[in-house]
């Protein structure tokens, strides 16, 4: 019985606070006092037993565990409802495969209404919400899934994706780390964690620009060197460079035609890009792959 005394003490404390409120009639206050005395007698607790007090009031504990997560404390689902809910989940998964995300959200929502304490339904709806760019709703669904099952690694992973999309990289890192704690061998979590950590370093750096491409590797790329050398043999580029040098030496007075030089430079750059595309498409693909890698990966995140 001693193990429940802190709980009973919290109940007594709550009842005593209520009895001192003006919202109750004298008879109601008297009834509360009787209830307090009964509990103190049965569990052998007195007001002096302050060592039984917990850090949070009973009302705050209740709010944190139930109201904050918007989860019904008990499920009234019957077996028929559970079966129907699972069927709706499967329908939602099919809609996800067909990229019909709004319909998927609707199916998962119906499943939740039938079986509100199933973490998978909330987590799957979070995935659909993210596909619709409803990232705040996705995070809320992940939080609900975690409230039901604190060991659900996929909920932490999907919350990390939504947080990354909202540029909340520090929180995303925390979510991915928790997901990896629960599922250490998941390559998707590892990859997304690295991306979030890189993004966090970029935004935290005083000189961060958000660009992480290795320019040194590009410059040292033999194909790039060949293309650059070829470009410099272009008579138009040679004429442009000569004109720019003349303007630089001549000072402001020689700056007439600067806009023309800029236009020529842009045109030369376009020719350079076209030449690379024609002669070395692999280098262009390297640049494209880098751009793609900057987007967080979610394709490997399968649905339950």
Swiss-Prot record:
Record keywords, A-Z: Acetylation, Chaperone, Phosphoprotein, Repeat, TPR repeat
Post-translational modification N6-acetyllysine, affected residues: 131
Record's keyword annotation contains rRNA-binding: no
One of the protein's GO biological processes: protein heterooligomerization
Residue list for modification Phosphoserine: 293, 295, 297
InterPro entries in the record: SGT, SGTA_dimer, TPR-like_helical_dom_sf, TPR_rpt
Molecular function terms, GO-annotated: Hsp70 protein binding; protein heterodimerization activity; protein homodimerization activity
Residue windows of the TPR repeats: 15-49, 85-118, 120-152, 153-186
Record's keyword annotation contains Iron: no
Job of this protein: Co-chaperone that binds directly to HSC70 and HSP70 and regulates their ATPase activity.
Assembly notes: Homooligomerize.
Family: Belongs to the SGT family.
Name of this chain's protein: Small glutamine-rich tetratricopeptide repeat-containing protein beta
């Amino acid at each position: 019985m001693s193990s429940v005394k802190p709980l009973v003490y919290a109940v007594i404390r709550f009842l005593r606070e209520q009895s001192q409120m003006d919202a109750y009639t004298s008879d109601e206050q008297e009834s509360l006092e009787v209830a307090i005395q009964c509990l103190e007698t049965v569990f052998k607790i007195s007001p002096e037993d302050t060592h039984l007090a917990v850090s949070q009031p009973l009302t705050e504990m209740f709010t944190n565990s139930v109201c904050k997560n918007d989860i019904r404390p008990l499920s009234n689902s019957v077996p028929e409802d559970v079966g129907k809910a699972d069927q709706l989940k499967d329908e939602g998964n099919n809609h996800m495969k067909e990229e019909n995300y709004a319909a998927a959200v609707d199916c998962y929502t119906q499943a939740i209404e039938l079986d509100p304490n199933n973490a998978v339904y909330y987590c799957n709806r979070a995935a659909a919400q993210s596909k619709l760019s409803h990232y705040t709703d996705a995070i809320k669904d992940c939080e609900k899934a975690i409230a039901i099952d604190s060991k659900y690694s996929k909920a932490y992973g999907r919350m990390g994706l939504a947080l990354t999309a909202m540029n909340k990289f520090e929180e995303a890192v925390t979510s991915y780390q928790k997901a990896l704690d629960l599922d250490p061998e998941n390559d998707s979590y590892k990859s997304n964690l690295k991306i979030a950590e890189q993004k966090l370093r970029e935004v935290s750096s005083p000189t961060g620009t958000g660009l992480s491409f290795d320019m040194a590797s590009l410059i040292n790329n033999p194909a790039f060197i060949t293309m650059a050398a070829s470009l410099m043999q272009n008579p138009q580029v040679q004429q442009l460079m000569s004109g720019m040098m003349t303007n630089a030496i001549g000072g402001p007075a020689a700056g007439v035609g600067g806009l023309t030089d800029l236009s020529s430079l842009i045109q030369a750059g376009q020719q350079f890009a076209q030449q690379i595309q024609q002669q070395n498409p692999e280098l262009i693909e390297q640049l494209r792959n880098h751009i793609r890698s900057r987007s967080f990966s979610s394709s490997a995140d399968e649905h339950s």
